[in-house]
């Protein structure tokens, strides 16, 4: 496509009335703008959550040293007096930062970035829809999410500080924390619960919208087995959110009532104050165990809410850059559906230490092992898709390729935790932290970074810079492994995840003869300094990415085609960037999503929307989505 054609595409949709800036960019109902809003907001929350982690890691590595100036500047004089002692992080501050780090990174960062940002921008384009099914509901979903996030983060400015009961918010601690505050609505723990309810409400609005959009707004000829895998992943993720989040929302409301109205849904009898040993004035008879069940019923499907968008991005990038079809497409579709189903019957493997009997623990051990099967199918299909391909090592492809082994490490290190005998020793140690972070950080975030580099040209009409991309990728890969792998070895040595001083008291009592991988338990405390240095370096090497995002928007190399990657899915048939209504023609789909290197075609890609030539063999006509849905 010529530059002149590209420029005219930039003005696609000008025949529609011009909206005021606040309606076009702030309170927009356009799925693309909302996707970008989600991405920017989630990115800001991720940076804040990352900062909290840096402070925590300093406390772990150097518990007797004050925070350096580049960390302590954010603390006002009042905050320093309240949350630091001689400039050092206290145990209370560590608990607060730990609770908010987990909450922010999961609920405010990765989930909205993967599902809401990428899903909002890409899904309607890939199915040939002009927008989401409910545009105003889509806008409401974003603003409810932002309100929930701000409520949670503003709790840092409360007299009590933010929540300190861990990101899981277990009762009875979470039900009684900050109880000295007269107005409980001004307590950080209460603000956390209010924010949680808002975030879940936002997710429910979004999930209904995604499910309806994918079922009802597919283009002509886009049958179920012609959907890109990305869309399948968004559909399954939507159902996970729709079915798993309501129990946690109910739990959040009940815990809120425990704090504000004096009820005892989760508060047991017989609790005594640790300060003075006096019995607490509670009605009692509640069940803390019930809250754990409600939380983890969401908590494990939530892992796949985090994971599936990243796998979806990688599944789009690998075929495009190997120039061959996605291996085992149907197997991957069935696997992701099975993964969604099984994720609802494994939650109690987080609760082996709560005293469940052998029968029920055997059931959850079995289902936990079973759920690894569809995960292995997905990962294996992506790896085999590389075999025999003409691989183009673009920046998206490099990130996608790195995702595969990193996610593999995260998955394999989770297998021992499926068995209660192993979990008895590893539960709440740094092994669990290392396993989870291998899945979320070098796993999921690498997949999402790949997605940013892949779709950035479509969003902006410009490429991201390759040099800055490599400067971002290679140090990030190295730093993440130096940050998270030592956690696995520390965990096997018994290091607990909640020690704000890095485990000084533990190693004093540890036997010098005990070692893991040839390193004694006492020597393993030095790994804290390695991990902290890696975390700080990792933060520094995210700067090239931020610079790349900003500078490329204004000065990046312009794309010369609406389909710069020579891809086959429908989003590349739109103008660049897509205008109002997305398409300049009514899209029809004639084939599957990954038709690369077909011997009967003159180029190495055969887009879904390209009509067959007269001399080509006619393909079996597809039913319209409406007819297919009616038959189903």
Model-found features: residue ranges?
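Membrane-embedded and interfacial regions of multi-pass energy-transducing membrane proteins
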Residues: 2-632
């Amino acid at each position: 496509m010529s530059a002149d054609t590209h420029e005219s595409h930039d003005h696609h949709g000008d025949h529609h009335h011009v909206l005021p800036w606040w309606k076009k960019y702030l309170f927009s109902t356009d799925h693309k703008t909302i996707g970008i809003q989600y991405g920017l907001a989630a990115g800001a929350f991720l940076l804040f959550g990352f900062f909290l982690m840096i402070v925590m890691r300093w406390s772990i590595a150097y518990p007797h040293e004050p925070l350096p100036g580049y960390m302590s500047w954010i603390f006002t004089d009042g905050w320093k007096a309240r949350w630091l002692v001689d400039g050092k992080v206290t145990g209370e501050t560590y608990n607060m930062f730990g609770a908010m780090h987990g909450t922010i990174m999961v609920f405010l960062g990765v989930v909205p970035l993967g599902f809401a940002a990428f899903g909002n921008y890409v899904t309607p384009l890939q199915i040939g829809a002009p927008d989401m099914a409910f545009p105003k509901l889509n806008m409401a979903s974003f603003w409810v999410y932002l309100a929930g996030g701000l409520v949670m983060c503003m709790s840092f400015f409360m007299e009590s500080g933010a929540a300190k009961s861990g990101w899981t918010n277990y009762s009875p601690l979470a039900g009684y924390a900050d109880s000295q505050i007269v107005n409980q609505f001004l307590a950080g723990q209460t603000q956390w619960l209010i924010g949680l309810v808002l975030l879940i409400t936002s997710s429910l609005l979004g999930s209904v919208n995604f499910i309806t959009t994918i079922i009802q707004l597919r283009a002509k000829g886009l049958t179920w087995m012609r959907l890109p895998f990305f869309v399948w992943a968004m559909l399954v993720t939507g159902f996970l959110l729709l079915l798993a989040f309501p129990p946690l929302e109910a739990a959040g409301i009940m815990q809120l009532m425990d704090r504000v109205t004096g009820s005892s849904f989760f508060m047991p009898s017989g609790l005594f104050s640790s300060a003075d040993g006096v019995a607490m004035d509670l009605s009692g008879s509640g069940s803390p165990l019930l809250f754990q069940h409600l939380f983890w019923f969401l908590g494990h499907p939530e892992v796949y809410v985090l994971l599936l968008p990243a796998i979806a991005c990688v599944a789009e990038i690998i075929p495009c850059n190997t120039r061959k079809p996605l291996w085992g497409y149907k197997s991957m579709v069935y696997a992701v559906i099975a993964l969604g189903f099984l994720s609802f019957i494994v939650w109690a493997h987080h609760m082996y230490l709560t005293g469940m009997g052998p029968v029920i623990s055997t059931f959850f051990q079995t289902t936990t092992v079973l759920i690894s099967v569809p995960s292995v199918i997905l990962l294996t299909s992506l790896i085999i898709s590389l075999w025999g391909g003409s691989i183009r090592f673009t920046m998206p492809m490099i990130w996608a390729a790195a995702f595969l082994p990193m996610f593999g490490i995260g998955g394999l290190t989770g297998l021992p935790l499926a068995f209660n005998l192993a979990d008895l020793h590893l539960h709440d140690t740094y092994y669990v932290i290392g396993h989870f972070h291998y899945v979320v950080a070098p796993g999921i975030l690498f997949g999402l970074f790949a997605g940013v580099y892949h779709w950035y040209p479509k969003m902006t009409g410009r490429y991201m810079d390759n040099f800055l991309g490599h400067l971002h990728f290679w140090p990030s890969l190295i730093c993440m492994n130096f940050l998270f792998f030592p956690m696995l070895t520390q965990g096997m040595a018994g290091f607990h995840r909640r020690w704000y001083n890095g485990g000084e008291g533990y190693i004093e009592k540890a036997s010098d003869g005990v070692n893991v991988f040839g390193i004694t338990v006492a020597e393993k405390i030095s790994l804290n300094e390695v991990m902290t240095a890696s975390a700080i370096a990792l933060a520094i090497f995210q700067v090239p990415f931020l610079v790349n995002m900003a500078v490329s928007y204004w000065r990046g190399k312009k794309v010369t085609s609406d389909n710069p990657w020579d891809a086959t899915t429908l989003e590349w048939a739109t103008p660049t960037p897509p205008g109002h209504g997305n398409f300049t023609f009514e899209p029809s789909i004639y084939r599957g999503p990954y038709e690369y290197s077909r011997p009967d075609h003159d180029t190495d890609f055969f887009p879904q929307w390209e009509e067959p030539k007269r001399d080509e063999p006619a393909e079996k006509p597809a039913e319209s989505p409406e007819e297919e849905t009616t038959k189903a």
